Amino acid sequence: MSILNLVRADLLNSKNYVPGGESARYRSHANELPWSPVTMGEHNLNYYPNIGLQIELQKQLAKRYQIYSDQIILTRGSDDGIDLTTRLFLTAGKDAFMQFPPTFPMYAFYVRLQQAELIECPLDRRTNFRLTLDQIENSWKPNCKIIMFCSPNNPTGNLVDLNLIAKTCELYANQSIIVVDEAYIEFANAPSATSLIGEFENLIVLRTLSKAFGLAGLRLGCIIAQSPIIQAFNKIIAPYSIATPSMELAKRALNNSDWFTKTIEQIKSSRAWVIKKFADNPIIEKIYPTETNFILIQTRFSKQLTTWLAHYGIAVRDFPSSSLLHDHLRITVGHDEQNQLLINTLSSFNADVAGLNYEKDFIY
């Protein structure tokens, strides 16, 4: 069975959009203006993005991720990769998508847009949200077209074991696409699932430049998979979807490996410092192990703390509507000044006033 049989049947015979006129002296085919009010180096922004620039960036990323250049396609951040994946494989009213909550809420968002079934296999906080193969097998159904791992998981911070990913790929080789969202993998002391790409044709890995690379404003990411799957994605991706300035700035940033290495080490060091300070705070009941640039904590004062911190200009992520995380907060590790302000503000929170109705009684 070809892995392409998992692609939506109505898309299999569709044709890729192929831009033309890339090397033409006069671009009289694309209805562009001959002038631009701004320029960016050698790039004329009055023209649609050049495919050559995209190929260069894909090769640069392929080298970094240790894959072949035909195993990668650029996306507008990880969200775009999730959207494209659900659109390529899920048939409305027929196929299902499995996720492991608590996890990134955009998975369910795009599944709903595709009008597909959502299979939820909840993680248990008593085991620090560890996932097992038995859980997957007990939740899987024959119409499950996509199994989505987030590793490290957002918002819990833990990794999915690489052996578990490999076993899942093998177990559902001709039945499901296995997707691994690795938005935070650079912060982890663990190998990437990209190391499995050559072994499993039903594996897709999503990466982004928004987190560890510090380029969230560029909206750039990529889909990594074996070449036939990448070619299938080309059938549905929008033409000229990646902006010229985003690609050019990303290329420049990726050349600065020293900055990247230093920044990752700084975040890891700061993360350890913040965790130590959290451990000294009596209102924080649990600190979950993390392989990311954020920390998940449990506190019965989650609602009050969110309001208290907001009063001092600090935004944190709470989960008031979650049955699993209603008494938890996710807090991002920042630079030294941000981290110190966070710790000082948490320390100033007095458990004696936690019973106030902050929406009513707190004076701003």
Curated annotation (Swiss-Prot):
Gene3D superfamilies tied to this protein: Aspartate Aminotransferase, domain 1, Type I PLP-dependent aspartate aminotransferase-like (Major domain)
Record-listed E.C. numbers: 2.6.1.9
Organism phylogeny: Bacteria, Pseudomonadati, Pseudomonadota, Gammaproteobacteria, Legionellales
Catalytic activity, reaction form: L-histidinol phosphate + 2-oxoglutarate = 3-(imidazol-4-yl)-2-oxopropyl phosphate + L-glutamate
InterPro entries in UniProt: Aminotrans_II_pyridoxalP_BS, Aminotransferase_I/II_large, HisP_aminotrans, PyrdxlP-dep_Trfase, PyrdxlP-dep_Trfase_major, PyrdxlP-dep_Trfase_small
Family of the protein in this entry: Belongs to the class-II pyridoxal-phosphate-dependent aminotransferase family. Histidinol-phosphate aminotransferase subfamily.
GO BP terms in the entry: L-histidine biosynthetic process
Subunit and partners: Homodimer.
NCBIfam families for the chain: hisC
Pathway annotation from the record: Amino-acid biosynthesis; L-histidine biosynthesis; L-histidine from 5-phospho-alpha-D-ribose 1-diphosphate: step 7/9
Alphabetical UniProt keywords: Amino-acid biosynthesis, Aminotransferase, Histidine biosynthesis, Pyridoxal phosphate, Transferase
Residues annotated with N6-(pyridoxal phosphate)lysine modification: K211
Species in which this protein is naturally found: Legionella pneumophila subsp. pneumophila (strain Philadelphia 1 / ATCC 33152 / DSM 7513)
Needed cofactors: pyridoxal 5'-phosphate
Top enzyme class: transferase
GO MF entry, a single one: pyridoxal phosphate binding
Pfam families (UniProt xref): Aminotran_1_2
Presence of the UniProt keyword Lipid metabolism in the record: no
Protein's name in the database: Histidinol-phosphate aminotransferase 1
